[in-house]
């Protein structure tokens, strides 16, 4: 049970190395002219970096650059604007931070000069992650650095900004707030703007904020860098208004390559709804010495399963959007620093975060589309030699999702779990939920939110709520019969209407 058996391969393995695409096309926002090449170096010591930066990189244990670093850092050091496309876990954080820090160093920035570099990123956790890397890289530099994110103390942030923060890492909403309202925030000397995970920033609704931010920030002689895992029309529009004409387009996600890391073993298991929790419980119980992330589709489902597993002495951490920022931050770093453990979370942790040495990614609730799948599994097998495994739970009615994954170049195997290895604790689970008022309420909330999330899936041909066996779904939440709940069902996951569907006892 600790390692599922590999039944059969769904796709071929990748055999090609990532390449750089630097040709000029209108689709790529007038990228560098054909024939222009970046300097190909492999070691950090081959770059003309300052001693404080080289000393920090050595202390961090890095010697050889990843593909995206080798392709991106030289042109950025030369002052070029860059539009970058790279796999998650490719090392792009160092790729943009090193040139930014070198720029501050060469200009001898001091606190009184204000903010010279701004890094914009979609989520608080990713901002904290980048801030942590920046802190290590700037250990031997005199320049100042800081972070502004939603949920943190705004007044304390404003005080630091007024004292002078040379490099600022920020989420879009809080950055716009400070740009508009914090007197004494000096950003007139801005020299570089970095937009990380641009597609995700736009996906979660920050398009208007980004346009306002770019309009406010000075653009004279400003270097800009935009990184995005996918190149959508909206990303191209954002690149057009934020980058100078003729940016260098660097692509290390070629069409012939698999969309996920080479060191990642990926599989799925076909499981009826009423057996899902039993299988998950059995798997986690037998892999307590591993480091595991379990993805669920809603905050309430995370809260329920975390409460349940902790109650029955299977210790887990939880991370979701309804937690206060300090709790999210503490949980994130606790799991990062742990050698083993289980983190149950929503997709808040699925993008960009670099959590060390994750052994397994479990997609207990299925992702909305292949891009979400790729970002989830990107939490393991990170770096050039990273290894990891992933397992996705699918019901028999959801197998159509495999076609979408195959079209997105995701190699997948089917795993089988012997039934005699699955713990049959259903009756004990139902007794517990019936007798414990708090768990009963959180189970009901989790059940309702699961159905709500299912109804909001964008792939309606795969995830059809009218084909869900509600009695079996209810059993996975510890109910012998479905509880009565209200859910909102819309024609699209983006704009559900007010039609109600009731599920009865």
UniProtKB/Swiss-Prot annotation:
EC numbers for this chain: 3.6.4.13
Reaction catalyzed: ATP + H2O = ADP + phosphate + H(+)
Phosphoserine PTM positions: 12
Effect upon mutating residue 375 to E: Lethal in vivo and leads to 70-80% of wild-type ATPase activity, a 2-fold lower KM for ATP and a reduced RNA/DNA heteroduplexes unwinding activity in vitro
Motif DEAD box mapped to chain: 196-199
InterPro entries: DDX18/Has1_DEADc (IPR044773), DEAD/DEAH_box_helicase_dom (IPR011545), Helicase_ATP-bd (IPR014001), Helicase_C-like (IPR001650), P-loop_NTPase (IPR027417), RNA-helicase_DEAD-box_CS (IPR000629), RNA_helicase_DEAD_Q_motif (IPR014014), SPB4-like_CTE (IPR025313)
Residue span, Helicase ATP-binding domain: 73-249
pH-linked activity: Optimum pH is 6.5. Active from pH 5 to 8.
Bias-annotated ranges (Polar residues): 26-37
Major subcellular site: nucleus
Region (Disordered): 1-37
Position of sequence motif Bipartite nuclear localization signal: 275-291
Short motif (Q motif): ranges: 42-70
Description of its domains: The Q motif is unique to and characteristic of the DEAD box family of RNA helicases and controls ATP binding and hydrolysis.
Subunit structure: Interacts with RRP1. Associates in the nucleolus with the 60S and pre-60S ribosomal subunits. It has also been isolated with the nuclear pore complex.
Protein name: ATP-dependent RNA helicase HAS1
């Amino acid at each position: 049970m600790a390692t599922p058996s590999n039944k059969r391969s769904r796709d071929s393995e990748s055999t090609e190395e990532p390449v750089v695409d630097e040709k000029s096309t209108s689709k790529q926002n007038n990228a560098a002219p054909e024939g222009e090449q970046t300097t190909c170096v492999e070691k950090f010591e081959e770059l003309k970096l300052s001693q404080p930066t080289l000393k920090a990189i050595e202390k961090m244990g890095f010697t050889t650059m990843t593909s995206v670093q080798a392709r991106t850092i030289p042109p950025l050091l030369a002052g070029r604007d860059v539009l970058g496309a790279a796999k998650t876990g490719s090392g792009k954080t160092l790729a943009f931070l090193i040139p930014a820090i070198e720029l501050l160093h060469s200009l001898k920035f001091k606190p009184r000069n204000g903010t010279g570099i701004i890094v914009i990123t979609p989520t608080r956790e990713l901002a904290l992650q980048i801030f942590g890397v920046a802190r290590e890289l700037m250990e031997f530099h005199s320049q100042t650095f800081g972070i502004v994110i939603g949920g943190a103390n705004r007044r304390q942030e404003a005080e630091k900004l007024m004292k002078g923060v040379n490099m600022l890492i920020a989420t879009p909403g809080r950055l716009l707030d400070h740009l508009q309202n914090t007197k004494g925030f000096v950003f007139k000397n801005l020299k570089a703007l970095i937009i990380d995970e641009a597609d995700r920033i736009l996906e979660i609704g920050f398009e208007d904020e980004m346009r306002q931010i770019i309009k406010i920030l000075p653009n004279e002689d400003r270097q800009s860098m935009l990184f995005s895992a996918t190149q959508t029309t909206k990303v191209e529009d954002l690149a057009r208004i934020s980058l100078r004409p003729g940016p260098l387009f660097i692509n290390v996600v070629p069409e012939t390559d698999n969309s996920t890391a080479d060191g990642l073993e990926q599989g799925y298991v076909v499981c009826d709804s009423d057996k899902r929790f039993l299988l998950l419980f059995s798997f986690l119980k037998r892999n307590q010495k591993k480091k595991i992330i379990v993805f669920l589709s809603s905050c309430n489902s995370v809260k329920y399963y975390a409460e349940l597993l902790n109650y029955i002495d299977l210790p887990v951490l939880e991370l979701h959007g309804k937690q206060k920022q300090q709790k999210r931050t503490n949980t994130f770093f606790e799991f990062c620093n742990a050698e083993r453990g289980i983190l149950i979370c929503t997709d808040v942790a699925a993008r960009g975060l670099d959590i060390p040495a994750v052994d397994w990614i479990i997609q207990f609730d299925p992702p909305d589309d292949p891009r979400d799948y790729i970002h989830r599994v990107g939490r393991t097998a990170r770096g050039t030699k990273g290894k990891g495994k992933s397992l996705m739970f699918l019901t028999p009615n959801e197998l159509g999702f495999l076609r979408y994954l195959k079209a997105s170049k995701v190699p997948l195997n089917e795993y089988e779990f012997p039934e005699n290895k699955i713990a049959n604790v259903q009756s004990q689970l139902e007794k517990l939920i019936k007798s414990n008022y708090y768990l009963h309420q959180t189970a009901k909330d989790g059940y309702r939110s699961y159905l709500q999330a299912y109804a909001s899936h964008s792939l309606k041909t795969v995830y059809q709520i009218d084909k869900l066996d509600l009695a079996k779904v209810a059993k996975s939440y510890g109910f012998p019969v479905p509880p009565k709940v209200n859910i909102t069902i819309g024609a699209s996951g983006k704009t559900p209407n007010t039609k109600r569907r009731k599920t009865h006892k």
